[in-house]
Amino acid sequence: MAFKDTFNKMISYFDTDEVNEVEEDVAASTDNVIPRSQQSVRASSHPKQEPRNNHVQQDHQARSQEQTRSQMHPKHGTSERYYQQSQPKEGHEMVDRRKRMSTSSIANRREQYQQSTCSDQTTIALKYPRKYEDAQEIVDLLIVNECVLIDFQFMLDAQARRCLDFIDGASKVLYGSLQKVGSSMYLLAPSNVSVNIEEMTIPHTTQDIGFDFDMKRR
């Protein structure tokens, strides 16, 4: 009996050692497994965090780009509006300037034309001499380069002949011209006026043949 007990104790001792070794192996294996699992979890958690960070950065960049675009578009719009507003103003200003220039040029042309016409303008005076002294007034008009249409219907023959001779001599001295245009009418013109009269037959019912003009007799 004592021998069996000792033998059983020895067996149990060796059995406990094996069990302890097995337990130690199991514990070691579990220790090794736990860090690996933790490492795998950590390793798996890190890639998840990196894409999140990338998404956050992308969102931030997109927002910043949108903000810059939103800031740029109003400026572009305002510049377009300013250009559109300024362009019609410039067009109206150009039209107004052209109108002013055209009106001023027209006014200048009118003034120049009026001045030229005034300087070159020739007047025709119609005179009905009644006495010999009226001939001097007619010659004075010729001196200032005026045309004179003379009608001798209110003069007698002798007075009309004397007046006509005086006017004819003055016209030659002043390089004018005296032409008959009617039965009792003569045209006295200065040297700067040319008179072209068509040839026509003037009726000479009561004409004095010697002096070649018709006078009403009183």
Swiss-Prot record:
This protein's record includes keyword Cytoplasm: yes
A matching Pfam family: SepF
GO annotation terms (biological process): division septum assembly; FtsZ-dependent cytokinesis
Gene3D superfamilies reported in the protein's UniProt record: SepF-like protein
Cellular component terms per the entry's GO annotation: cytoplasm
Main subcellular location: cytoplasm
Localization per Swiss-Prot or TrEMBL: Cytoplasm
Biased composition (Polar residues): 29-43, 102-115
Disordered: region residues: 25-115
Keywords assigned by UniProt, alphabetized: Cell cycle, Cell division, Cytoplasm, Septation
InterPro entries: Cell_div_SepF (IPR023052), Cell_div_SepF/SepF-rel (IPR007561), SepF-like_sf (IPR038594)
Transmembrane segments: none
Stretches with biased composition (Basic and acidic residues): 47-63
Assigned protein family: Belongs to the SepF family.
UniProt function note: Cell division protein that is part of the divisome complex and is recruited early to the Z-ring. Probably stimulates Z-ring formation, perhaps through the cross-linking of FtsZ protofilaments. Its function overlaps with FtsA.
Assembly, per entry: Homodimer. Interacts with FtsZ.
Protein name per its UniProtKB record: Cell division protein SepF
Organism whose genome encodes this protein: Streptococcus pyogenes serotype M1
Gene: sepF
